Amino acid sequence: MLTDGKHRPGSVKMGYYALRFLFCNIYHKEWAKAYLPTPKVAKTLPLVLSQDEVTDVLGAIRNFKHRTAIMFIYSTGARVSECVNIRLTDIDSKRGQVNIQEGKGLKQRKVPLSPVLLSLLRSYFKKYKPQHYLFEGAGGKGTHLGVAAVREICKKARYGTPRIKKAYTPHTFRHCFATHHLEHGTNLLVIQRLMGHADLSNTLKYLHVQQLNPDQVINPLDKLNGLEGLCKDK
């Protein structure tokens, strides 16, 4: 698999770990990397839309509930699975925050509630009157919008945004949340907490996709004392 060129790096890596599991857990042998080198898997950068592109996509989503769900992801950085599982009790308008449950471990992170998102949700409540989950499913009370249904929202929106050639998905808006925060100057450690990343390296990847504004970059040479004299031929 390592040399025939017929398998994707991810498949090779899965085969590697399966073989190591068999060697260590079934045959109870000590594993050494010398037996087989760890396959290298190229890291791909996250797909990110510009803020103008985000506006175009949101404008292409006609259904108010569907548009609100995507705006919720973009405003909070929630994963799609976290978004659909948000309950009404997770929205704390008094403290101005959203409580996001992270997976099965029920670990929780608190994300600031944007004034724009809060206003949007109030309009949403008036129209849909959700009872339990914020984004209820077709079954009504006690059910929530499915992950596949949220993916379908973006799939349909792509037909309405032919100028955007990027194959964006709902998760793209989580990437946009982090990247646009960086572009607006939010501290990387703050973004790590907002995203729920246990490892900072998962957050660092957004440094590679952010668009740098030349007006925000201060060159250290420009801040030296005594520049006037240094820039003249003596």
Language-model regions: role of each:
Residues M1-K234:
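Conserved catalytic core of the tyrosine transesterase superfamily
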